[in-house]
């Protein structure tokens, strides 16, 4: 296995994507991140890290709820899953990497390494939501993606504070 963290590449989308497609993409990435943080919270021995990742699980749930509400306000009905490739949230999270790959990489790593990876993923999500905000035409969708970007920035601030505390 390679020594470095998995590639946190950008999840690309076309500037012509429909708003509902961007909502579905964001929802799937939030679900993947929720799964990642759930895995971390369950396996971490660092108490402060465990508390932070547990709080992030709740934040990702709120993000998904905001995106589902936006989907419904945009005319969608039911759940978002039918819009996703294969009809269900996959194993991909913010950063465009697989949850299973990221969790495998974190096994046996210390809190600082795990926070470094998490910061890279949250930075990617922050960037993605800014791009989505600029891409959509709908004012409500712009506000939701702007709010998500701000929340990702808040997550980054919290992670950065914790990693600095541990340095």
Predicted regions and their residues:
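Non-heme di-metal
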Residues: 2-167
